[in-house]
Curated annotation (Swiss-Prot):
Pfam families: PALP (PF00291). This is Tryptophan synthase beta chain. The lineage of its organism: Bacteria, Pseudomonadati, Pseudomonadota, Alphaproteobacteria, Caulobacterales. SUPFAM superfamilies: Tryptophan synthase beta subunit-like PLP-dependent enzymes. Pathway: Amino-acid biosynthesis; L-tryptophan biosynthesis; L-tryptophan from chorismate: step 5/5. Its cofactor is pyridoxal 5'-phosphate. One of its GO terms (cellular component) is cytoplasm. The modification N6-(pyridoxal phosphate)lysine is found at K99. Belongs to the TrpB family. It comes from Phenylobacterium zucineum (strain HLK1). The beta subunit is responsible for the synthesis of L-tryptophan from indole and L-serine.
Amino acid sequence: MNAPSRPNDYAAYPDLKGRFGDYGGQYVPETLMPLVHELTAAYEAAKADPAFQAELAGYLTHYVGRPSPLYFAERLTRHYGGAKIYLKREELNHTGSHKINNCMGQILLAQRMGKTRIIAETGAGQHGVATATVCARFGLPCVVYMGAVDVERQKPNVFRMNLLGAEVRPVTSGSATLKDAMNEALRDWVTNVHDTYYLIGSAAGMHPYPMMVRDFQAVIGRETREQILELEGRLPDALVACVGGGSNAIGLFHPFLNDSSVKIFGVEAAGEGVETGRHAAAINGGRPGVLHGNMTYLLQDRVGQIEEAHSISAGLDYPGIGPEHAWLHDVGRATYLTATDTEALEAFRLLSELEGILPAIESSHALARLPEITREVGKDGIVVLNLSGRGDKDVNTVASYLGRQI
C-alpha cells in the first residue's frame, strides 16, 4: 500500500468529520452521538471566543505556572557529546506534569456547558491528580476511574486524588489498566448524560477529544518555539517526546508540523521488547483498528481482539495511540521509535545523576533515545525533549527495579 501524501497544511486537520486521513472519527453508539455533537459544538464556540481563551490563559499563568522553562541540559549534552539538548520542563507545572494544561481547558469548557459532575480515567494517576485538582479549584464533584493494577503501582497519586476530594474507583475488568478504566468511564458517561462531563486525558478517543486535547496541550510547542528562537535564534533540528496516547507529544509537535526542517520523534514503550509481545508500542507492534471511538493503530490479535499492553510505566500502558500520531506516522512526518523498560530506567538514573532532575518513567522513554537522535542531527544540532512529568511518583518502581527497599 502506498503511503498517503503529506498535506500542505497540517493545521487543517482533523477534517469536519474528525478524521486525520484514515484515522480518528466518531465510532460511537447512537446513544452517545448527541453528547458528542453537543461537545463538538460547545468546543468550537469556546475556541472562537476571545473571552474563553483569555480566561484559560489567565489560569495557565497564575495557577499552573506557565510558561514552563526551556532548560539547556549542559551535562547531559556533554555526556552524549553531540547536539545541544534542551528540556521543556513540563514537570515544573502545578501537579507535576503536562496533564494540567488540558484539564484546565476542559474544566472551563465543562462549566461553560453547565455540567456539574466530572469523570475521568487515569493510568499513572497524573491525569487523575490534575482532574481532581481543577475540580477542587472550581468546586465540582470528581470521580476517577483507575485500573486496579495501576491503583497498586501508583499509591501516592491515589492518595493525592483522595486528598483533593476525588473518589477513585478501581477497575478490575480486563487487564485492570488504562484501557479498562476508559471503558468504565464511557459507561458512566452514557448513564449520566444530563449532568456529567467526561474529561479525557489523552489525545485519543472519539472526535472532538483528540483535537481538543491537542489544542489545549499545544501551549507546550508554542512556548518552545518562542523560547528556542530567543535562546538560539533558530528552530531546533529535532523534537522528541514519549508517546502512550500521545498528548504531551502532540502538544510539543503540533506547532512545528509545518516546519519541514524540524525532525519529529515519538518514543513508544517497548516493555520487555516488541518481539516478546509484552509491550505498549501500538505503531511499532500493532495495526489499524477501532477502540474507544476512533480508528488508530492498536495492539490486537489476528481476529482483532485488543491485546494487553505492557510497560513499566503506567502512563504508557495503553494498547492504542492518538489518531493524529497514527496519521503522522503514515504520511512520514514523524518517526516513532521504542524504548524498553530497562532502557527507560537507565535513562531515569542518568538524568537524575547528571542534571539533578528526576524524570517520570514515561518521559524517561524519550530520554533513552537521545544517543541516536543527537547523533542523527550532529554536533551543531539542537534537540528539544519534552520532560512531560516528574519522577517522584515512580521512586517505588525504580527502587524495586534496583532491588532496594524504601
